Curated annotation (Swiss-Prot):
GO terms for biological process: Wnt signaling pathway. Signal peptide: none annotated. It comes from the Eukaryota. Pfam families: CK_II_beta (PF01214). Transmembrane segments: none annotated. Phosphorylated by alpha subunit. This is Casein kinase II subunit beta. Participates in Wnt signaling. Plays a complex role in regulating the basal catalytic activity of the alpha subunit. It comes from Spodoptera frugiperda. GO terms for molecular function: protein kinase regulator activity. Keywords: Phosphoprotein, Wnt signaling pathway. GO terms for cellular component: cytoplasm; protein kinase CK2 complex. Tetramer of two alpha and two beta subunits.
Amino acid sequence: MSSSEEVSWISWFCGLRGNEFFCEVDEDYINDKFNLTGLNEQVPHYRQALDMILDLEPDDDLDDNPNQSDLVEQASEILYGLIHARYILTNRGIGQMLEKFQAGDFGHCPRVYCECQPMLPLGLSDVPGEAMVKLYCPRCMDVYTPKSSRHHHTDGAYFGTGFPHMVFMVHPEYRPKRPASQFVPRLYGFKIHPLAYQIQQQAAANFKAPLRSLSYNNGKR
């Protein structure tokens, strides 16, 4: 960066509206080529994108070609997301995400009996472009769509399918107990038997069958 007052690309990206789920990946992690194995085959303009993430001087061609610059910017976001998915499986990355988890930065479970349990981001696919990020509740162990629409366009592959499970494998002390209570449907104060709905549906089906037959016979007269 040309000025000491300017923030790094990583800080800028993580500070964007809608990117609140991301943590700042350590530059030392990115500079270790081993951690980036295979990403050059997944991301177009890989070299230029990596330079942008690390705040290295861009090629002169980018300054002369605005369209190319936009493509590299898009590639940088994809590359950072894929690096992020790997980084948050490391001890340092897990530590950063746990801080956000404890602060409730990822939101809280909407299920009443989970009692506002903080959630963790989860991808339903590790392939970019297949599914947007979801939120995993470790108490009811179910998955939810983020409450805010600004997170509905964040790719789930940037967090990965195994992140929450890795967190609780490494730090089992953060895993909450399963909820002791479960909602029980009642009518006039009495519990509704699980088979009640099935019996009602069957009764309704049996009631409609004679009516259809009667209507058919009336139509032939």
